[in-house]
Amino acid sequence: MEAGKLMRTCGLWTVALAQLAFSADAAPPRPVETILADYVKAVGGYQAVDRLTSRETVADVHHGGRVTLYWRKPNQVLSMSKNERTGYDGTRGWTLSKKRKVKKLARGAEVPIEMDADPLRYVHIHDFYGELNPAPPGEIDGERMDVIVAPNNLSATKLYFDARSHLLRRVDESGEVSAYFENRVDYLDYREVDGVRLPFRILHTTTEPGGASEDLRIKTITHNMALQPEMFSKPQAGQVVMGGRR
């Protein structure tokens, strides 16, 4: 009789624990503004981020040589490698090939460069996403993530924030750069530089056929050097674009 009671008691505890686990998994998502407030605090706070006016990032691309990225507040960016230079002056983008041929950058093609040169852009996420909605928690590599969804006309961008560190871990973009394919950016290996926390590894992947992955390993980051605005402007054909500090 006692054994029967014990078995029934154990059974009830098993059901109760299962219900608790289900309730935890089914917990409502955290509010968007709470997730964002935790993120801003984790990277150093508004004051620390907003005092930065420019950035030079030197990185090695895995199996792809060295690249130098420049960012000038609010959204001018320049990427310089041995064979190519790509810039965005805040209005239009361009690419200068090794043969000094200048081409117009396709719509939205500047976004991946902005994400590399200024990963802290998401501190002011409301500047470029008109609508932000909470989503059920996700998981990356066994770690729980808070998720925010920014819908667009074709699909949505999903942003994953580590539930423990509150740092931005991943951005899955669909419908902005491409109507058909998903582009993913993973931010890894955060370190403190000048009072803010920045990723020192940025991994790009895409579902686009033939699209190349890119693994950016950052070597140095320098803030608040003087950068001339014309270095981000579209050059004339044959003109050499000079980058670096002024």
Task: Give the ranges of each region predicted by the language model.
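Gly/Pro-enriched, hydrophobic low-complexity segments
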Residues: 141-235
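Acidic/charged, solvent-exposed loop-and-adjacent secondary-structure segments enriched in E/D, K/R, S/T
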Residues: 95-122
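Gram-negative outer-membrane assembly/targeting C-terminal domains
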Residues: 233-246
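N-terminal mature ectodomain segment of secretory-pathway/periplasmic proteins
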Residues: 27-101, 128-136
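Short, conserved active-site entrance elements at the starts or edges of catalytic domains
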Residues: 112-147, 167-170
